Amino acid sequence: MKFTGKVWKFGDNIDTDAIIPARYLNTFDPQALAAHCMEDADPDFPKKVSAGDIIVAGENFGCGSSREHAPIAIKAAGVSCVIAKSFARIFYRNAFNMGLPIFESAELFDRVDEGQTITVDGDSGVILLEGAQTPLSIQPIPPFMQELIADGGLMKHLARKNRG
């Protein structure tokens, strides 16, 4: 599982209301959610994000209320993965359940600039920064979690397993 994309940086304590404002929770349509993804944190994000881009954030990303809408919005916006110093535990679980790859890195936020291109190798646990000589390490995603992501989330994974 390898991703290359442009970095969008967000600070600490980005809550689920900043990821997808509550006023848009009347739909589960991924494209409708994508149109408003991160707009309270950066009003230009939904218009400027491109497929494959990567969100890099500070501590406690995804805190606040539990809602599956948040990882759905991020994924539907075209973001390939999210890397943060830390995640709220409920967001961490929801992200994998919805098939959104996420990684924790204590170092990346302070070493990368918004707009910089990075490559994330989730299998080997390496992040390469454009123009940097030294790679950063991350914890690789365990094989079972990689299966969830490859299948598009927990429900699709269970449906595939039940079909046998």
From Swiss-Prot:
The keyword Hydrolase is assigned to this record: no
Pfam family name, one: Aconitase_C
Metabolic or biological pathway: Amino-acid biosynthesis; L-leucine biosynthesis; L-leucine from 3-methyl-2-oxobutanoate: step 2/4
Family annotation (InterPro entries): Aconitase/3IPM_dehydase_swvl, AconitaseA/IPMdHydase_ssu_swvl, IPMI_Swivel, LeuD, LeuD_type2/HacB/DmdB
Recorded superkingdom: Bacteria
Record has Lyase as a keyword: yes
A GO molecular-function annotation: 3-isopropylmalate dehydratase activity
EC number: 4.2.1.33
Keywords, in A-Z order: Amino-acid biosynthesis, Branched-chain amino acid biosynthesis, Leucine biosynthesis, Lyase
Annotated catalysed reactions: (2R,3S)-3-isopropylmalate = (2S)-2-isopropylmalate
UniProt xrefs under Gene3D superfamilies: Aconitase, domain 4
Any one biological process term the GO annotation gives: L-leucine biosynthetic process
PANTHER family membership: 3-ISOPROPYLMALATE DEHYDRATASE SMALL SUBUNIT 1, 3-ISOPROPYLMALATE DEHYDRATASE SMALL SUBUNIT 2-RELATED-RELATED
Protein family: Belongs to the LeuD family. LeuD type 2 subfamily.
Its biological purpose: Catalyzes the isomerization between 2-isopropylmalate and 3-isopropylmalate, via the formation of 2-isopropylmaleate.
Subunit structure: Heterodimer of LeuC and LeuD.
Name of the molecule in the record: 3-isopropylmalate dehydratase small subunit
Source organism (scientific name): Syntrophus aciditrophicus (strain SB)
